[in-house]
Each structure stands twice: as structure tokens, then as C-alpha cells.
Amino acid sequence: MNTIPLTFDEKLPSCTILGGKEKSFSVKYPISVLLLGRNPGSYKEQSLDVLINSGFENIITFETTKDNFKLEKYVQKFPQVKFIVPSEKVSVGEMINLGMYECKSEYLLVLWDDLVIKNQIFNDFLVNKIMASQCACFCPVFTNSVLQNIPVQMKPHIEKGSFEVIPSQVIYDNTYTLFPYDFVGVFNKEKFISVGGFDSTIKSSYWQNLDFSIRTWLWGEKIISSPIFRFTYEMSETILDSTVDSSYFRFYLKNIAPVYRNKYAYIPLSYFFQFHRRSSLSFSNAMKEFKLARKWVAKNAYHFKMDINKLTAEWGSEFSK
């Protein structure tokens, strides 16, 4: 695998940017919106109609359509919107990194075009709550297309040395959650940059999200969810694919393996043999991956405020609201 990036903009994907020449009118909030696409239907156009009239500073959207006529139509109809057309296939985290790079606001709201986006999705009360939270990401709760609540509060758990994530319902306001479900939430730009953004070398969406989010916690920031911030899926909700693959091994070494001692973190050399046994990698490939991760942890050693064992132990008390 490639060298692990140290900053969110170190390996931004190449792209073409269209539109965004006109300023948004009636700006009310220091928030820009990144609208991600995975629905080939007509929901994107409806969503953009709502978003440009909702008081946000800027609207950015990723456009993956091969229909140049439709894209040109969008650009003409929504001159306030910045359309990003990637030159190659990109991961969700890479899209958010690029959206954050283009974002000129204090906050970036990440959404999907298969969510029901209605008028006044934000109000002064919600924005003030987000800003007062001082968290790295403020996350919504979700219902599916038949209005059933989706368990989106994610809790870390270690059982017999194995790390796992336990989902549950969000009941209380300002509930801590391990990661933003489906990448959706209001990201604080300053904190996003300070923790390095999403790792573009991790291709699995699940492990990429978990890597960013656990790093956020281990480096002393917080991720919060609230039932007053809510979205519904137009169709079926996303399925979280936690298949163990090469992305998992990089996630594991960066987040689960580090040990925190005396105000810094490191990966003990002795951990290599345990990693090699558990991975499906050859000895030489396991050693290469281990060295890359150990080097990355060493460069970021003093950013860590805890390790995964402390985070999991404290989740049941300080981090469990």
C-alpha cells in the first residue's frame, strides 16, 4: 500500500470544477454544503433547489454523471453551485477531503442526494447548538423510508482483544458516537484539518470512516449526535460493509495498535508478530505495512491523547451520555 498521508490535502484527486461563479443569496449560516451523489434519479435537482434557498454560504456537489447535457443543464440552472467532476473513481473520504479544500466556511455539512432534504433543514437553534458543541463533527439521526429509526449511535467495544463496534439508538441530546453514520454530519473545518482528514489510501468506505473517526477521538476531539438533527432516506438506507480486507489492516495499525504512554503514542516492535499472524499478508508485505504505520504513528505521536483501550474503558463513563 502507499505511504500514509499526513494532511487531508496531501493527495487530492484530480478533477474539473464547473460553476459556482455566483454568490449564494440570503446567507444566514457559516456553513457550506457538500452534496454527494449515488442516486441516478431526479432527487439531486430537488435537493439543490432546497439547499440554495436554505441560508448556506456555498453549495458544492460531486457529479459522476456521464451525461454532459444533464450536467450542463445543472450548471446553467444553479450558477451558485460548484460542480466537481472527478477524473477518476474516488472514495467517499476523498470526496469529502476535496469538498473541504473547496469549502470557505467554518463548517461543512456533508449530505447524500438520496436523503429527503426539505425546506428549513437548519434553523438558528440547531446552528447555535452545533457551534456551542465545539465538536469535530455534529451528526444527525436517521429514519428509513418507512420511518423506522436506524441505530446510529456507535460504541467501541473490546472483547478478548478484538475490537468491535456496537450500534444503538440515539435517545438523548448531545450523545457521543464513534463515527458519523454514512459520513453525514456537520464537520468543523479547523478540527477536520487538525486531525488530517480522511486517509485516501484506505479504499473501504467503512474502514476509511472509522479510521478518521477513531483518530479524531484518540487525538482529543469529539463526535456528537442529536435527535433534533434528523434525516430520512428516500429509499433503502445504506448498508455498512465491515469486511476485513487490506483497508482494515491499515486501520488496525493506525488506531488499534498504538499504545499511549507519557503523553505520546507508539507501536511496540513486538506487535509485529501478532499483526502478521492475524493478517493474511506475507511476511514481507506485513513488515512493509507495519513499518509504514509505525512511521506514521511516530510522526503524529504527540497528537494522541489516549489509546483505544482508554477510549473504550472511558466510553462507559465519561463518553457515554
Predicted region positions:
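Active-site-adjacent helix/loop segment of glycosyltransferases
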Residues: 223-320
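Glycine-rich, basic loop-to-helix element that forms the pyrophosphate-binding segment
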Residues: 86-103
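Acidic donor-binding segment of Leloir-type glycosyltransferases
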Residues: 49-85
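N-proximal low-complexity "stem/linker" segments adjacent to membrane-targeting elements
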Residues: 1-49
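Short, flexible, basic/aromatic active-site loop/helix in glycosyltransferases
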Residues: 157-178
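Conserved donor NDP-sugar-binding/catalytic core segment of glycosyltransferases
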Residues: 120-154
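Short beta-strand-to-loop acidic/aromatic patch adjacent to the donor-nucleotide binding site
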Residues: 106-116
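A short, conserved alpha-helix in the catalytic core of glycosyltransferases
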Residues: 179-187, 191-196, 202-229
